[in-house]
Structure formats: C-alpha cells, structure tokens
C-alpha cells in the first residue's frame, strides 16, 4: 500500500465582497469600451458633416421609411427611427439599471444614496443656472435641460484609463451620481419637453402602466410580453403629448429586480439534484431532461431584470448608442458664422457642462462631507474630487437627445447647441483627466474592484 497522499489545502471561499463587485466590474468594462466606440462614431459624424459627403450624410438619415399593418400605416425618417424608436430601448435599459441600483445596488439605502444624490442635485442645478444666465429671454432658453446630464459611457471610459489614480469607491460614487442624473434627465424630458397633452391617450397610457405593474407583481419573465405592452405604451404616450421614449423607462422600472426564489434555496436544490445525478451509475448517461432541469434550477437564481440587462446591454452599448451618435453628432461647421461658434448658446452650453458640473458636484459633495452628512468616497483628496467632478461634465447622449427635443431637427439653434455640447464635453474630459493624472497613485488597490477595458442611458 503506497504512502498516503497529503490532503491538499482547501481553497478559501471567494469573499462576499468579490462576488458583489464582479457584476459591477463587468458593467464598467462594458461602459469603457462603449465610450471608445461612441467617440469614434461622434468623430466620424463630424467628419462626414464637414466633408464633400455632407449632403449624402444628411440625406441618409432623412430617408423615409414606412410600415403598414392592415388599415394602419405610418411613415417616419431614419433619424426618427433612431431617436424615437431605438432610444426607447436605451431608456428601457436605463430604467432597469436605475431599478437595480435602487433595489439591490449602491442606492438601496438612504445612507448610501445620500451623497451621490446631493452631488447630482448640485450637478444639475448649477449647469442649468449657468445656461440660463447666458440664454434667458431668448429662444435658446428652451434648452436649459441640455447640460444637466452626465454620459456614463464616456465618463467611466476616462476613469478607466486613469484607474491607478482613482479609488474604486470614487468610481462607484460617480456611477451612482450618473444614475441620479439619468433620473433628473428623464423627469425633465417627461415634464418639460412634451407637447399638447391629450387626456384620453394619457389615460390609456396610465392603464398600460398599471398593466406593467401587474405583470411585475405576477413575476412575468417574458421579454416579449413586456415588449408588446411597452410598444402599446409608446404609442399612447406619443399621441398623449409626452415623449414616447419615456415608455422605455416606465417598462424598465417594472421589471422584477429580485429572484422569485431565494438564491440559498435554489443553490440547495441544485446541490441536492447534483448529488442525485452523481449517485447514479457511472456508466449511465445523463439524459438531456436531467441536464435541462439543472439549468432551469440555476436560471432561477437570476432575476428577470438581470437577465434582460445582460441580453440588451451589449446591443445598447455597441449598436444603439453609436448609431445615435452617428445620427446626431454631425454639425456642419462651415454653415455657422464665427459669431455663432462663440455665441451665447454654444458658449453657455459648454460652460454649463464644464464649469457647472465641476462647481456643482464639487461644492455640494464637499459641503456634505464637511458637515458630516456622509464620508468622502474612498477617503479621496480634494484634487481627486475636482478631477472626477470635471469628468462628470462629459454630457453627450442624453444632452444631444434633449437638445433635439428643445430645438427640433435641422435648426441653427440645434447646431449651435451641438457645438457647445461637444466642446464642453471635450474640455471636461481633458481637464478632468489632467487633474487626475497629476494626483498621486492610489496606494493600495484590491484586485476585485480593478477597472480594466474589455463598453450604454
């Protein structure tokens, strides 16, 4: 009889912290890559709009499409399909991410949510005030909601490139802040950028919203079922005078965020089922039904919201948002007078994004920390807080979206606003990155929360 082999040491269990952080790591990697794709599409749109192909570029997105179902018919441009149709899916994912953070994520308790909420309020109020200081009393004042948003894809992309100098807690803080920014932007779109409210259609929309709530309470897990009701809600809101993309947000908030069965109970069932399979004769093949049952038990751990986000997020990050950037970032600078490039609308928008976000977020956060309302995320220095506050001034996707609602397509005001959005976002990203680059490296980083580039509202 040979010598007894020593029992290998047991591998320690994965810390709970690592298990919680891994989904956030995946989210951050996805957003970082999406930022690169978004930037490429924005540059391509600007290049096309200022090239000999500018007429073809505009004509392509003005292409008229049509749909007919029996006696019902509709015509719309390709730009409308992107802005009103595909962006509904974008806002659907935004709605789900908001619900996930509020239900099981970083914003699930008041203490966790308080600091990013205060920072977000400052980061929305100060930019709006600066914008109105430049444009009050003019037709451009309608775009006061433009500089309120933070583009999470670009923002996290910049922070990812500087991961050695940004504490992970500060990245989580900025992500939570952007979630509140999204909520603010959604409320602004719903309340201030509608047109001619029609109570009959809004009543129908209310009924469909109640249907979504009932589906959530009944734990409906079919994405197709939610899509069908959301399409009807989109139609009702469109005719009711509220921007139809809000249907995506409402649907996203209705998706169940928790598993129906507790993960512990599911895992216990999986363990028992696996033990039964292992007790079977070794020469007995596992039939497909047994394997399928095991897969179904494992699927019960994931909530419908988690499953839908996992399925749709790559499409939003790498298809819908880049197509939106390609359709909406093109500004023919040759058609604008020099005075318009440095006019009140363009400069007001750029300053509102850069200075407004920087001052609003930094001051509100600093006051909240100094007053003992909440601790500084990761014990970050004032310089690091200044850096991330500046980076949060990158407002792109939702800012362009609100500008389109405020000024309408193809107008000179819209082009001036786009110049301001692009300039303000560029300055915010560059200045924020330079400030963070000059700060000391983070002394100790756990491997779990590391940000690495592997990318959406």
Swiss-Prot record:
It is found in: Cell inner membrane. Pfam families: Na_H_antiport_1. GO terms for biological process: regulation of pH. InterPro entries: Na/H_antiporter_dom_sf (IPR023171), NhaA (IPR004670). GO terms for molecular function: sodium:proton antiporter activity. Gene3D superfamilies: Na+/H+ antiporter like domain. It comes from the Bacteria. It is a multi-pass membrane protein. Keywords: Antiport, Cell inner membrane, Cell membrane, Ion transport, Membrane, Sodium, Sodium transport, Transmembrane, Transmembrane helix, Transport. One of its GO terms (cellular component) is plasma membrane. It catalyses: Na(+)(in) + 2 H(+)(out) = Na(+)(out) + 2 H(+)(in). Coiled coil: none annotated. NCBIfam families: NhaA. Belongs to the NhaA Na(+)/H(+) (TC 2.A.33) antiporter family. Na(+)/H(+) antiporter that extrudes sodium in exchange for external protons. PANTHER family: NA(+)_H(+) ANTIPORTER NHAA, SODIUM ION/PROTON ANTIPORTER NHAA-RELATED. This is Na(+)/H(+) antiporter NhaA. It comes from Anaeromyxobacter sp. (strain Fw109-5). The lineage of its organism: Bacteria, Pseudomonadati, Myxococcota, Myxococcia, Myxococcales.
